Amino acid sequence: MQTIAAPSPNFNARTAPPDMIVLHYTGMPTGEAALARLCDPEAKVSAHYLVEEDGRIFALAPEERRAWHAGVSFWRGETDINGASIGIEIVNPGHEFGYRPFPAVQVAAVTELLGDIRARWTIPDARILGHSDVAPDRKEDPGELFPWKALAEAGHGLWAEPPPAPGAALVEGDEGAGVFTLQAGLTRLGYDSAPSGAFDAATATIVRAFQRHWRPARVDGVADGETRARLIALLRLAA
């Protein structure tokens, strides 16, 4: 696999080997602008790699170092996601500048890059995540158009499409055992969703993040039967 060197000064030392990969979209008008920002010492942001829409892969920071891509984030009790992960920025204008599908050549490059990274580090499928998974209250990337299913079919990440679970949908304002079970499942998967039994705004935000990754056809924050069934199936796969 060929990469283009584009060294960023924005990294520091790790305290442990990475065991997670976090995928982002750049969310800027052009890839050139994103690359410039990721290499700007005043910006204090970076990633390990940037993948352009034409499939070119830029190497920004050594994998052995802690790049600054995740910000305030959480997954399975870990709050230093930068320290635990390798960050990949995927060029796409994002929701603010004209979100669009990811070209096949770009997805192929991301897939190849994931295989290359995972040949060097022990990174389980359950720990290949989106920025919106680890920071659902702040981020939406790489978003509902990112082909997570195709990535999983290529051997990277989790995916499940079981039949919908029975029962009424759970929505913001609901309370009870069903909501508690939903929150407990989201927490087991990795989200910061302490079970309370009350479906509040924070729970709806996390459900939307889950849907962006694992039920992208409809991202509405409603825990319907399809959403709940996929959560249950993913918990089995991640166990």
Predicted stretch roles:
Residues F74, G94-V105, D137-R138, A168-E175, ...:
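Second-shell loop/turn segments in exported
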Residues L50, E144-P166:
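Acidic, His- and aromatic-enriched active-site or binding-groove loops in soluble protein domains
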